[in-house]
Amino acid sequence: MSFARVRTALRCQRAAASPAPPKVQARRFANKAAPHASASSAGSRAFHLGLAAGAALAVGGAGLYLFSRSPVLLDAQLPVKQRGRARSISAAEVAKHNSRDSMWVCIDDEVWDITNFVELHPGGAKVLEQNAGKDVTKVFKSIHPPKTLEKFLTDDNFVGRIDVDEVTKIGGGKNAEDLRIEQARKELRNVETVVCLDEFEEISQKILSEMAMAYYGTGAETEQTLRDEREAWQRVRFRPRVLRKMRHIDTNTTFLGIPTPLPIFVAPAGLARLGHPDGEQNIVRGVAKHDILQVVSSGASCSIDEIFEVKEPDQNLAWQFYVHSDKKIAEEKLKRALALGAKAIFVTVDVPVLGKRERDLKLKARSQNYEHPIAAQWKAAGSKVEETIAKRGVSDIPDTAHIDANLNWDDIAWIKERAPGVPIVIKGVGCVEDVELAKQYGADGVVLSTHGARQLDGARAPLDVLIEVRRKNPALLKEIEVYVDGQARRGTDVLKALCLGARGVGFGRGFLYAQSAYGADGVDKAIRILENEIQNAMRLLGANTLADLKPEMVECSFPERWVPE
């Protein structure tokens, strides 16, 4: 169901409802941006929030929100009525409301009646059913932007407050995974001891929930493409030059006319709050120290407003654009990003439907097992669990109807008309023919990408596509800016791509893992690691500037040994 239909239906329900008695003003859920703090000073403060969310809430790769799948707030805040003295609710009473007929959830210390919202929920009814009568604070905050409650619910849905000591009786306390993560965070070594991006992933495996690791790490189906992307970098070898004056190294360049001190950018990657309470804001703060370009994900767990509000005045952020099937909504989102100051628009074109991400799906299937506590509750209540699962499907891949599956090359003109003077980049290109079409239809750049190997399993690694462009139409590399991502982890990976003609290389998962473990300090450290590796490798390769990186400096051993001309 589209957000427009959700809003219309909710407003109709509210119009038909009888006036509610005056109540005190609702408490806001939006917190002001927390000041930057190092991992060592933050300790375990609030780090457990959002880390041990129930596996039933991680599906596909879009992140299944309890209330809203879109972090972009398109509407003005819905009016909140005055509330009187809040009614005290016991855990036992909350737990009773766990069916379609009466469904309550607890967020922080507040109890909400979401019965009339179940069928309207953009993420589907099942995820609400699985968490009915429970405390959902951790999972809610880990994947939802602030003000989500205020956007979709009114004071009529407010039931009362639950005593803090009662919350643990409905799942609000620390479970075994919470305690494991809390202890692992206490044992984190100093961020300055990390020497490469791979270490951030190794460290994150200890401090992330099973759900977060599945979401961040999964590829599509057999994960052939996920494996192949790492191997692709190893199939390109250097042909270094020696006896050159290598004391001074210059790594400055421009992306889409935007100056950058390094030929790297932060690729869009969603749900950073699964790893850290500050989520995408950590990445913005860490990147600000280095002035490299960050492409803000449309699937972020912070709202677009939250993300842009913590950037430095001169910091450059671009925005990832999933074109909504409702062009009016698509235009509203685009206008909002531009109004906030997005310097470029990265149009994602490789998601006409969501890929089959089996690590996510297997984890969710386990949570839907008949013996799962929620299923046991259904059974006790007389629900037909097997019939429900059979009808809706265990995988329950999130509905992607809001993404325009009919998006085509003619739509590029529509986007350019609504973003005059702003660079447009096509993200998700997988062959030389589509690079040619991108140039033909007026795009300023392309990102050779497989969506993190999360879409079409068996698709070629982006680096192999870059080699194809170099072989079949090398002139394109001077006519349109070509970027590449796909499991790059090293400064040497960046140089290999630049030797083959890429303008720059995007890093996604590496920054997710870095911020998960160490917040903004982790992002800062990751960039410093890459900077050092790039400069060191340039000296060893014999290149003083990025312009000195030439095709003849590499040898490609797949699909055949070949030295580019």
UniProtKB/Swiss-Prot annotation:
It catalyses: (S)-mandelate + A = phenylglyoxylate + AH2. The keyword Iron applies. It comes from the Eukaryota. One of its GO terms (molecular function) is (S)-mandelate dehydrogenase activity. Its cofactor is FMN; heme b. The active site is at residue 451. GO terms for biological process: lactate metabolic process; mandelate catabolic process. InterPro entries: Aldolase_TIM, Cyt_B5-like_heme/steroid-bd, Cyt_B5-like_heme/steroid_sf, Cyt_B5_heme-BS, FMN-dep_DH, FMN_HAD, L-MDH/L-LDH_FMN-bd. Residues 86-163 form the Cytochrome b5 heme-binding domain. Residues 189-559 form the FMN hydroxy acid dehydrogenase domain. It is found in: Mitochondrion intermembrane space. Phenylglyoxylate binds at residues 215, 322, 451, 454. Its main location: mitochondrion. One of its GO terms (cellular component) is mitochondrial intermembrane space. Its EC number is 1.1.99.31. Coiled coil: none annotated. Keywords: Aromatic hydrocarbons catabolism, Electron transport, Flavoprotein, FMN, Heme, Iron, Mandelate pathway, Metal-binding, Mitochondrion, Oxidoreductase, Respiratory chain, Transit peptide, Transport. Pathway: Aromatic compound metabolism; (R)-mandelate degradation; benzoate from (R)-mandelate: step 2/4. It is an enzyme of class 1 (oxidoreductase). Catalyzes the oxidation of (S)-mandelate to benzoylformate and enables utilization of mandelate as substrate for growth. This is (S)-mandelate dehydrogenase, mitochondrial. It comes from Rhodotorula graminis.
